[in-house]
Structures are given as structure tokens and as C-alpha cells.
Amino acid sequence: VNDELIEILGSENYELNLKSKPPAIVLLAGLQGSGKTTSAAKLAKRITKTSNKKVLMASLDVYRPAAQEQLEVLGNQNQIQTLEIIKNQKPLEIAERAVNFAKSEFFDVLILDSAGRNQVDDKMMKEIVTISKKIKTTERLLVVDSMAGQDAVNTAKHFNTALDLTGILLTRVDGDSRGGAALSMKSVAKCPIKFIGVGEKVEDLEEFHPDRIANRILGMGDVVTLVEKAHEEINEKEAEDLQKRFLKGKFTLNDYSKQLNQISKMGGISGLLKYLPGLNEIKNKIEESNAVSYTHLTLPTTTIV
């Protein structure tokens, strides 16, 4: 069963193509409310962190109130530069200005957050297709809400026909039934899933690995991803120092706070349990443990004060 699931999901994982002549242009498309703007920030943060590349974000959404400002705020919060907002510019003009700015300032990657559109809105679809062709995008990713069910699959088929997608970014996979939406998405839309959003934090974006998702669907956990998250979030030197302190029988409130902070960075106790075999089903029963942990994080500071 596991082998069949992997075959359905795709036997390999697909990486972003960022090897083109800078800047590599990544265009995010999708329906309204699918999470494109947040996903743009998550993707930019991930590329910056894992590939050590200089990333610029730009919003092409001139229709939704404060959409451009939202991306600017996310950029400021995560130390990612965004294109200066100039009012009354059309999406294509913004895209061309973003490309020119990215070239002049030597950015490696440009992420374009397009406006959310209705799949039956031909005018909006033509607009994004024109933008993609004019600026010669490197990657065209469709952002899809995995909770949308069959609608998500239909959306992927429609966008793939119009835009010739290079990949899919599934959001809210943490709320889905362990990733079941990914099954029909890959087989029906004929487009590889490249990333999955597994939470609300900017760090909660993972590369899509078919074998790991198959294990999650079958309730077998995903220990490899857990190890990778631990490697990303835990400072190796601090961990070694803490281990030496433990062996000497020393453990302070500050040490306790650091341990809880590390767990918090990795998604809390319930966030860790979903990666362990057989424990995903009980994680919802201990959600309150996260709240307790966050409260305890303030104890050392409160005690000192």
C-alpha cells in the first residue's frame, strides 16, 4: 500500500528551479483566499534560509484593499525586501518594474504575488497569462487550499491549462486529513506538488516528499522531516553545552526555558507528535499542553523581576 501511494503521489520530489540567470522569477497564482500572500513570505523565508539567496517580493494585487501593504508588512517582519508601492500602477507595470529593480540590485530570486482570481473570470486569467509571458517567469506555482476538496483539483486543472504550471503549493495541509488532498491533486492535475504549508508561522513550509506524505497518510509518521526540523531550529553548540550541564547535574530555570523555546519553534508538543508513528490521532487531545508550555516560557523572567 505504501509503495502504491508513493507511485500515485509521484515517485520523486521536485525542487524549485533557481538556477536560471538571476533573477529567477517565481509567480504565485491561485483563487481568492487560498493563502498566496502568506505563502509568498513563507517561500521567500525558506529560500533565504536554505539556499542563502537574496530574495525580493512584489505584490501585483491592485484589486484587494491593502494587499500590497500586507506583503510589505510580512516582508518587514521577516527581513525580506519588498518592492516599493506606487499607487495606480497596473499589475504588468508593477511586474516589469520589479524585474528591472531585481536586476539592478542583484537579487537572485523575485517572488511575485498575483491577485486572487475566480477560475471562471476570463479577464483575470488573461491578465496573469500575459504577465507570465511578458516577464518570462521561471516558476509558476499554483497556491491551493487543500481543504477545498474536489474544488482544489478542478482549480489546479484549470490553471494548469491556462498557465502551464511548474508546480503546486498546498496550504493548510495541517488541517487536512494527513495530506489526502495531495493524492488526487497529483494524479488528476498532472502537475507536481513542490511545497506544503503545515501551519500559520512563516517557517511552516515544507518541501513535498511523496514517501513522507505516504507515511503520514498511513499513520506511520514522518521521522525524517522531524529530524530536519530539529536540525534547522536547534543550535548544535547550545545543545552540546546543555548536555554537558545535564551530565554535571546542573539544570536551571533558564535551561528549562530554552528547552521549551526549542519545542515551541518546532511547532509545540502537538506539532511534534504529528511526525511520530501512531501518535497523530492523539495530538488534538493535548493541544492545551502547548498553552501551558508558552506560559512557562515567561516564568524565569517573571521570577527574576
What name fits each language-model region?
Residues L74-D164:
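Switch/coupling sub-region of P-loop NTPases
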Residues T295-T301:
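Conserved small/polar residues in nucleotide/adenosyl-binding loops
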Residues Q243, F251, D255-Q262, S270:
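Conserved P-loop NTPase/AAA+ ATPase motor core
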Residues V1-L60, A67-N88, A95-K103, D108-S114:
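Primarily NTPase-proximal linker/entry elements flanking Walker-type ATP/GTP-binding cores
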Residues Q119, I128, S132, E139-K248:
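Conserved phosphate-handling catalytic cores of large alpha/beta enzymes
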